[in-house]
Amino acid sequence: MAIGITACVLSLINYQGLAYSAALINEPIQACVIAREVDLTDDIRTKFAQCLGWQADQSSPVCLGFYKPIAVTPLASPDEVRILADTASFYRTQRSTLSGHVEMQQGQRVVNAQTAYVYRDPKTNEVTKIEFLNHVRYLEPDRMMIARKAVVYPQDKSGEVEDVLYRFNTNRSNALLPAWGRASLIKRFANQDYFLKEATYTTCAPQDKAWAIEAESISIDNEKGKGIARNAKLRIHEWPVLYTPYLSFPTNRDRKSGFLMPIVGYSNVGGADLGIPYYWNMAPNYDMTLVPHLYTKRGLMLGGQFRYLTSKSTGTFNGNFLPKDKAFGRFLQDNEVEFPQIRGLSTNRWEVNFVDSTQFLSDLQLNVNFQQVSDDYYLQDFSTNLASVTQRQLLRQADLTYTTENWTFRGMGQSYQTLHPINEIPVSPVYERLPQLMARGYYDDLPFNAQFNILGQYDQFHWPNDSWNIALNNMPQGPRFHLNPILSVPMMKPWGYVTPSVQFVENYYDISRNYTWGTSRANYNLTIPRYSLDGGLYFERDLHLKGTYYIQTLEPRLFYLRVPYYNQTLIPVYDSGFMIFNVDQLFRTNRFSGFDRIGDANQLSYALTTRWLEDESGAEKANFSIGQIKYFSERRVQLCQSPTGFCTDNPDTFGNLSSTFGTSPVASRAVYKFNPAWGITGDYIWDPATRATNNADLNLHYQPARNAIINGGYSYLVNGDVTQVRNNDTENNALHQAILSAAWPLSEKWSGIGAYSYNISKNYSMMSFLGVQYDSCCWAMRILGGRIFRSLNEEFEPQYNNNIYLQILLKGLGSVASSDPSGILNTYIPGYYDPFRRR
């Protein structure tokens, strides 16, 4: 009897399990085929675990087990069909029957069953369909299906199975285990996409009831790397908690379009919050996320983020818009009589933020940073970060930089939006630079090892119109030209160095002031030389400490600076200010920031630094520095500006030091690493003029494991408090704050997270949150309660934004969150490991 099956080899042999190891499934296949409508009991789940190849392993603390791999040895030809069976009956004009340990293999696809029927095209005699019954097991790379019935179409490699228990190994973004579930029908298409009817889907272990999707249908698109569930219910521990007609989820690590999990939450300033994010994967190099939010106290906000990445550019655009904010409208109505400056403000709230970096050529780069909000209270109402809530200056800047071997050229435009919340001392606006043109040259190959630096900069300063303080609208403005050439001759030896340097600073101003009666103009030209001599020595010795060999260095340094005095109080202050004194300021050539004030100097800085370096690796174990400046004359240049040419700086101004005392504060710094997990850094500055601390900070970091962190910080700065209000007095105007933050495992799966910041000088907390986090094999959860300092009320009592964060991550599916607190956690817990960001 002729078989006549094209590209098909039929063999009658005793079953040996040639293409698949039967050890993967310990229970008979029949026990795995259970009708879809039958509820999953613990016994059934145990059977399913065995059927799917689950191997319990208590040494795996998270998942408590693993799946045995699906191994298929492919045939030499992907089109070859090989069938094995105990017995077979073949016919030309009717279906052929195979019985007993049937195994069919085509390429990398293997199907096992007790019975199979082979159908052929009567004209071509080619196999068109093979039907499998009883104890069906369908295998492909990373795919396993156990079913009552299966049909395979060898021509296009499609197929379908009925009453299925399946396991799909897909490369999901953060799931630790493959997906598994049941379906009444699974269709496998020629392009290797799948359609599941009346199906369940989960990435939990078979005996874990944590979560599952139950859907009318699930479509899996392998090329796009996504799954779509329709008419789906999310079950948590078998209880239905959410219904959605459409749910999209990833099946690999690629980005894909679709709705994300809903956002739910509550805050005292916005009320209940419901959001439906939609992610649009527009192209491989740019995407967009749209997030409509419904706030019960405010209204409907539409937010979005657009990201792009090209061969030359990378950037992000963020925007939010909330029309007719109900809560803000009530705020305006309640306060416009007492504070008329807020009268007429729109209740439409919005924010835009744009960041871009474009590399046109290897030596030509454009950077843009732009942020603007609708009103002075937007950040207070919508930000969850203390740094943003208390921010009062929003940068808007674009610069174009061209770099050569010896020169850098830059053109820049810069301005700020200044926020003026009521009940605060008004923050002075910042001058606009429209434009700034800069050229900087550097040559280090001159004769006698000399180095030459030159900086030329042109700034056109504009004073922004400020409706909050009309008196400031006649502020000086106009162009400034700054030139600063520097010639130095470093003389270096292994044991030390000496570097003499000479330079001069030239500033030219063309100043105008606008008055009601007209405009006044004035010109100033200032040329000031600077002379300095910098020298230091290097000593080192071997050090043996607790079984480890170190090299200890001792580095004394002297720095003499001479700058003659020139009265500069007639010149406006565009960008200069006092600086916080620390070790770094010991060796600066100007005690003021910016270019508008050139500090006079006749002084000698002296400092001593010691380092401990590991002998083998060279890693720094410790670094201690201490230093001071000896003044040989009083400092006469003042920061203040006066049309008379005479003024005196306010001694309580932020960063101001005594101009008559013979020495500077003593500055010290320490960095010490006890071990790779534990380190401490700190600065302490003692001012002998006031016999008190000028500023200090101390930071501790302990991280013995990736998910175990403790941070502590303390800051003190005279006149540095950032929460100034109208009734402040000098005594409590120091920045005096402490912060403690931690993320610590409580067990294999549970951890605690929290942070607390306290304003010691004003006696109230600035920020606090506390929560717990659970991270298991197939899901993670964290709940945090916290508050962020917002402002002070009319009685100067602190007001807070109170938030509750609830975030649930279903690994392999997505997250449900009140709002993602990852930014807060990463800000206040440096080094924090976030399981919700696992990739």
Curated annotation (Swiss-Prot):
Keyword entries, A-Z: Cell outer membrane, Membrane, Signal
Predominant location category: membrane
Subcellular localization(s) per the UniProt record: Cell outer membrane
The keyword DNA repair belongs to this UniProt entry's keyword annotation: no
UniProt cross-references to InterPro entries, sorted A to Z: LipoPS_assembly_LptD, LptD, LptD_C, OstA-like_N
Entry GO terms, CC: cell outer membrane; transporter complex
Signal peptide: 1-21
Gene Ontology biological process terms from the UniProt entry: Gram-negative-bacterium-type cell outer membrane assembly; lipopolysaccharide transport
Domain of life where this protein originates: Bacteria
PANTHER family found in the cross-reference section: LPS-ASSEMBLY PROTEIN, LPS-ASSEMBLY PROTEIN LPTD
HAMAP family: LPS_assembly_LptD
Function of the protein: Together with LptE, is involved in the assembly of lipopolysaccharide (LPS) at the surface of the outer membrane.
The family this protein is said to belong to: Belongs to the LptD family.
Assembly description: Component of the lipopolysaccharide transport and assembly complex. Interacts with LptE and LptA.
Name of the protein in its database record: LPS-assembly protein LptD
The organism of origin for this protein: Legionella pneumophila subsp. pneumophila (strain Philadelphia 1 / ATCC 33152 / DSM 7513)
Lineage: Bacteria, Pseudomonadati, Pseudomonadota, Gammaproteobacteria, Legionellales
Protein's gene: lptD
